[in-house]
Swiss-Prot record:
Active site: R220
Alphabetical list of Gene3D superfamilies matching this protein: Single-stranded right-handed beta-helix, Pectin lyase-like (2.160.20.10)
SMART domains: Amb_all (SM00656)
Highest classification ranks of the organism: Eukaryota, Fungi, Dikarya, Ascomycota, Pezizomycotina
Name of the protein in question: Probable pectate lyase A
Length: 321
C-alpha cells in the first residue's frame, strides 16, 4: 500500500539549502501530540503519553522518577542531565521529549523493557559506557517510536568501551526509528542480538528505519536478525559496514544513499533484501534477493537524489514545540 510520492518540492522545502554538517540545522515545528508512522503505527498505533500529565525535568533524580510509571505522561527534558549510571527504565504510555537541542542525557541511557506505547523525541543520548548498557534499548516491548534523536559516543576508545546506540532485541516489535542522527560510534544499531535467539525473535522485530543520518560508524547500520525491516531514505556518510541482513531477516531497502564505505547492503549469514532506487556509492549490494516487496502502511518516499539534502541538517534534535 506504499504511497510512492517522489515529492522533490517537499524535500527542497525541508532542506532549504544543501548542508554539509549537522551543526547547520533546519528547525521543524512539531506537536507533543504527534503520533508514530511506519511499523510503530501498526498494532493499535503509538501515542506515548498523550492525554496524560506533563512534567518538566532537569535532574537525574527528577527524570528517573518521572518516567518510571505506566500511567500516561509526557516528560520534557530541559537541559543536559549528566550521570554515570545504568539505563533508566521507562514505563509504558510515556512520551520523553527534549525541550530543545540542549536536552541531552550524558553517561546513561534508556531501557524500555516489557513495556508498550513509548515515544522518545528530540533527545540527545551520548557516551554511555558499555558497563551501563545501550544509549537506547528496547526489549520484550512493542509500539516504540524513536524520532529526531541524537545518539553518539566517540571512536577515540576501543570498540568495547561503549555498547550500542539503538539496540532492539528480545522480540521487540512495531518500532520506528526516524529522523535521528546516529554518529561517531563503533557498533551503532543491533536489531536481534544473537544467532541463537530465533525462537524468541522470529515473527517479531517489525521495524521501520527512515530519514536518519548515519555518520562515522564502523558497523551495524543496522545489523538485523530474524525480523522484518523497512529501511528508506536514510543517508550514510563514512559508514564502514552498513545494513547487514542476517538469520532469515527480510528487508525492504528503498531510496537510501551511501557516501564512503564499501559494504552498504550485505549478508553475513542468510538474510535477505529487496533493494529499490538506492545509491550505493562506491559499494554494491551483495545481499540475497528477498521477498518483502510491500509494507502494511502508507509512506512518502523520496528519490535517492533528494535524500542527502532532505536528511542532513533535519535529522537529529531539530524540533521545536
Amino acid at each position: 500500500m506504499a504511497n510512492f510520492k517522489l515529492f522533490l518540492a517537499l524535500a527542497a522545502c525541508l532542506s532549504g539549502q544543501a548542508l554539509a554538517a549537522p551543526t547547520k540545522t533546519i528547525g521543524k515545528r512539531a506537536a507533543i501530540t504527534d503520533v508514530a508512522h511506519g511499523y510503530a503505527s501498526q498494532n493499535g498505533g503509538t501515542t506515548g503519553g498523550a492525554g496524560g500529565t506533563t512534567t518538566t525535568v532537569s535532574s537525574y533524580a527528577q527524570f528517573t522518577e518521572a518516567v518510571s510509571s505506566d500511567d500516561a505522561k509526557i516528560v520534557i527534558v530541559d537541559g543536559t542531565i549528566t550521570e554515570t549510571a545504568d539505563q533508566v527504565k521507562v514505563g509504558s504510555n510515556t512520551s520523553i521529549i527534549g525541550k530543545d537541542a540542549n536536552a541531552i542525557l550524558e553517561g546513561f541511557g534508556l531501557l524500555v523493557k516489557e513495556k508498550e506505547n513509548v515515544i522518545i523525541r528530540n533527545l540527545g543520548v551520548k557516551k554511555v559506557l558499555a558497563d551501563n548498557g545501550d544509549a537506547i534499548g528496547v526489549q520484550y516491548s512493542n509500539n516504540v517510536w524513536i524520532d529526531h534523536c541524537d545518539v553518539s559516543s566517540d571512536r577515540d576508545h576501543d570498540k568495547d568501551y561503549y555498547d550500542g546506540l539503538i539496540d532492539l532485541t528480545h522480540a521487540a516489535d512495531y518500532v520506528t526509528v526516524s529522523n535521528t542522527f546516529v554518529h561517531d560510534h563503533w557498533k551503532a544499531m543491533l536489531f536481534g542480538h544473537s544467532d541463537s535467539n530465533g525462537d524468541e525473535d522470529t515473527g517479531h522485530l517489525r521495524i521501520t528505519v527512515n530519514n536518519n543520518y548515519l555518520n562515522n560508524l564502523n558497523s551495524r547500520g543496522p545489523s538485523f536478525r530474524f525480523g522484518t525491516g523497512h529501511l528508506y531514505n536514510n543517508y550514510y556518510l563514512d559508514v564502514s559496514d552498513g545494513i547487514n541482513t542476517r538469520q532469515g531477516a527480510q528487508l525492504l531497502v528503498e531510496g537510501n544513499v551511501w557516501s564512503g564505505g564499501k559494504k552498504p547492503l550485505y549478508s553475513t549469514d542468510d538474510g535477505y533484501a529487496v533493494a529499490r532506487d538506492n545509491d550505493f556509492g562506491d559499494g554494491e549490494n551483495t545481499a540475497p534477493e528477498g521477498t518483502l516487496t510491500s509494507v502494511p502502511y502508507e509512506y512518502d518516499l523520496l528519490a535517492a537524489s533528494a535524500v542527502k539534502d532532505a536528511v542532513v541538517g533535519t535529522a537529529g534534535q531539530t524540533l521545536t514545540f
